[in-house]
């Protein structure tokens, strides 16, 4: 399972550390003997903790190497540690998955790397880490700073306006991982940029190249503006940008197209629409050859392109555009407006509702979710699973056994439901980040489900339902009493949990398969 998780001395000549460097590689290999001294001699280091067999590590390797080469010129070293050879070192650094990327400012000061795992993102992120939260601007470095990153925010603030500067500096501190910030109190520089003091200007390498803030100097207002101004009118969805779009707080419109030429044409066609609805929805193209499978997640035919769909992450809602229609910008704009106005019902992917329930575990589909999980006065434990998930398959017999504890007793079944839903074949209201995910929806508090993270034994799951459900049903006690009543006095049979449920092993604990 993956987990995610200046002032530098030159790498050449200045370091007394002997670090094993791979041939013709700018990524430096460290071990137990070299790690501490290297970190203490370098003011800023990005470290990758990896395993040679790890697929994600192999995918990252060439990008990490390219970033190391580019950052070497800026005296920002990138290092790596093989955790299969350095188990103690990796354990001491809290490594729980591969690859783990950490930023070090000395051996005792580290934090997780939070950027994308792409060359450009690694370089941009680490450059921002090497600079102060707010860099100083003068006539000589203005143009260099304006183009130092894809997004640069500069405050033109007079020296006597400390209130505005302090608000700007505070915001910069909170967002230094995401944007590059600078400031100047020179009125002449502000004038040369066509702005009056105080002003905040966002420079970018796309669209209109710069935007000037005209709102209140307040953290939330500034942040909302920066997020909006830094988003292209029509961008491109990929590994580097996806999380930003999903976390933007507004719906996202996807334009699936197979060729670069098509995507460029749609970009131009949709720019006026994006400008009209800026701040209400983001619009972006996506390479259908590389990421066409994602169309299926939006309830589109993933074999038919071009295609268009809107996703509202806040509502977990999807609005696919009719693929039988031509993808005409003017017609699609009407669809966008109708979605924003609430005139379009979201598309819900669902398996057929079972005609009858077979077995102790209740099968839930999207169209029965509300009735079986939400609109009732029962404590409902729901497993979100995927058919291909190994951990889900391992859980299945124990989950059946758990469900039988309740289903075999009408008085318990009236208060507790043990259920499952195939989250790959049915749309579910809340995001699922791994399989299996187990959530308890207590009676009277369905809007506050409780996610289970303990060992997946029958006993522990039953106790979880008892302790967190409204009805506090103790199914284990009922089962134990029945066993004792039906067994021989001198040689009582062990309970179901004693006979069939071994102590949890490491593999039985709350592992998840990646989505």
Swiss-Prot record:
GO terms for cellular component: endoplasmic reticulum lumen. Its main location: endoplasmic reticulum. The record marks 117 as: Lowers pKa of C-terminal Cys of first active site. It is found in: Endoplasmic reticulum lumen. Residues 21-132, 339-470 form the Thioredoxin domain. Residues 506-515 have a biased composition (Basic and acidic residues). The record marks 456 as: Lowers pKa of C-terminal Cys of second active site. The keyword rRNA processing does not apply. The active site is at residues 54, 57, 389, 392. Participates in the folding of proteins containing disulfide bonds, may be involved in glycosylation, prolyl hydroxylation and triglyceride transfer. This is Protein disulfide-isomerase. It comes from Aspergillus niger.
């Amino acid at each position: 399972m993956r987990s995610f998780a200046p002032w530098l001395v030159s790498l050449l000549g200045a370091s007394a550390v002997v670090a094993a460097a791979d041939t013709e590689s700018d990524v430096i290999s460290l071990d137990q003997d070299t790690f501490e001294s290297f970190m203490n001699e370098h003011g800023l280091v990005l470290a990758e903790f990896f395993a040679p067999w790890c697929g994600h590590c192999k995918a990252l390797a060439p990008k990490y190497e390219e970033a190391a080469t580019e950052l070497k010129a800026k005296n920002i070293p990138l290092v790596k540690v093989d955790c299969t050879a350095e188990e103690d070192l990796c354990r001491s650094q809290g490594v729980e998955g591969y690859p783990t990327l950490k930023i070090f400012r000395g051996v005792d000061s580290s934090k997780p790397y939070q950027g994308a795992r792409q060359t450009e993102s690694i370089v941009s992120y680490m450059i921002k880490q090497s600079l102060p939260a707010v860099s100083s601007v003068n006539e000589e470095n203005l143009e260099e700073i304006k183009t130092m990153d894809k997004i640069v925010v500069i405050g033109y603030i007079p020296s006597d306006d400390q209130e505005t500067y302090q608000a700007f500096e505070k915001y910069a501190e909170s967002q230094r991982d995401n944007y590059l910030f600078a400031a100047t109190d020179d009125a002449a520089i502000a004038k040369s940029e066509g702005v009056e003091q105080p002003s905040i200007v966002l420079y970018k390498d796309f669209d209109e190249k710069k935007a000037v803030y005209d709102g209140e100097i307040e953290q939330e207002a500034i942040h909302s503006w920066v997020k909006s101004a830094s988003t292209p009118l029509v961008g491109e969805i990929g590994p580097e940008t996806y999380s930003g779009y999903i976390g933007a707080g507004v719906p996202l419109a996807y334009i699936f197209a197979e060729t670069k030429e098509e995507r460029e044409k749609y970009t131009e066609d949709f720019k006026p629409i994006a400008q009209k609805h800026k701040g209400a929805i983001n619009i972006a193209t996506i390479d259908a050859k590389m990421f066409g499978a994602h169309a299926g997640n939006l309830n589109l035919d993933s074999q038919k392109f071009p295609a268009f769909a809107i996703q509202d992450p806040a509502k977990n809602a999807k609005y696919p555009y009719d693929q039988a229609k031509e993808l005409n910008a003017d017609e699609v704009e009407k669809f966008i407006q109708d979605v924003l106005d609430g005139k379009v019902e979201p598309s819900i992917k669902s398996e057929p509702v079972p005609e009858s329930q077979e077995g102790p575990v209740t099968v839930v589909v999207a169209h029965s979710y509300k009735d079986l999980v939400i609109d009732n006065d029962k404590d409902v434990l729901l497993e979100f699973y995927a058919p291909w998930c190994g951990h889900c398959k391992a859980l299945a017999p124990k989950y059946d056994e758990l469900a039988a504890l309740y289903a075999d007793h009408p008085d318990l079944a009236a208060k507790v439901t043990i259920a499952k839903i195939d989250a790959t074949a049915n749309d579910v209201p809340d995001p699922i980040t791994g399989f299996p995910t187990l959530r308890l929806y207590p009676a009277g508090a369905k809007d506050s489900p409780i996610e289970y993270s303990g060992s997946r034994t029958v006993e522990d799951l039953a106790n979880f339902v008892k302790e967190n459900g409204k009805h506090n049903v103790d199914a284990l006690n009922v089962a134990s009493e029945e066993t004792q009543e039906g067994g021989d006095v001198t040689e009582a049979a062990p309970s179901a949990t004693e006979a069939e449920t071994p102590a949890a092993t490491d593999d039985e604990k709350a592992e998840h398969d990646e989505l």
